[in-house]
Amino acid sequence: MKQALAQKARIPLYRNPAMRGIAAQLAVLAIVVWALVTIFNNTVANLRVRGIQTGFDFMDQVAPFAIGFSPFIEYKLGESPYWLVFLIGIQNTIIVSILGIIAATIIGFTVGVMRLSPNFFLSRFALLYIETFRNIPVLLQIMFWNFAVFLPLLPFPQQSLGAGWGLFLNNRGLYLPKPVPAEGVGIWALLAAFIIGIVAIVVLSRWARRRQYLTGRRPPGVLYGLLVMAGLVALAFLMFDAPLRFERPELGRFNLSGGIQVPLPLFSLWFALSTYTASFIAENVRGGIASVSRGQTEASQSLGLSRAKMLRLVVIPQALRVIIPPTINQYLNLTKNSSLAVAVAYEELVSLWAGIALNQTGQALVIIAMTIVVYETLSLITSAILNIYNKRVQLVER
């Protein structure tokens, strides 16, 4: 026994499987680092030979071009620097990504449930939608909706379609009332009322869930929370004499002025990305629902649950563990596909920063590297948030 242990202790390091694995990983890491350093040195040397100076000094220079859409960051032609252009590009990318994710999720879940509907026409319509939208390149869809549908079919600003309450739609975009806060403490009271209302919705929805576990009946907790929010907001308006007013768009001689303009390229891009991504999410939903044991649906039907309650209370909660992982990938694809906005002149990160700013400054290495880092960061943040939610909906086994 002692001889066997002594012989095992004398095994050379090069024959130890663990040490060989570590050595192989270190060798691969060294090769990757060497390749990256070589590429960087060659790039810097080639730029130096051509007299091109690279660095971040250009970020403080004034950008000599106009930006048409920046809802949250103020940009002034001839005054704003390039770093502000970079932030506006990130802002516009995040806007279309968030709007697209919300719309694609709603459409995808709806179509996915319709795909399994016993109604022949609903299920066939869902199948036609999925097979049509997911088999056409997304760039072609973006250009189709913008140049072949919305741009020629929507009227000119003088004949704008109005829906009341200051809503107008024409071939330049969608115009909405703009909220303008009043000075003083009233706007802060209104904001506090809104936040308290959100907290009330969360608290009352959890209370309703606990009541359902105890009694079998679920009170309308979300509705109660919405009523609390509406009451608090109305109270703030009455006490502080309308701390928030809305500036409506007004039709001038040639165009609309005032309010908020959602440019047509943004609307076209959002519509195309939402409908395209929703076709893949619908298949994820269909597969997730199909993965739930048939015995679960039969047990729900035996308890007298309607199809809507069966889906909401039994099937979909179990299907989420299958639906969410591939859906995360579709959210990431939607964010990256937003870079195709340059085809319809929407001013997002690639169009503004990796397009106009790059052509003006010539700092290709720095600008492209920053663009890559932004998309990588957005993808990691999206994945992290959804992975946290995915862990919460996983089945807990004993």
Segments and roles (model prediction):
Residues 2-398:
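Transmembrane alpha-helices and adjacent helix-loop boundaries
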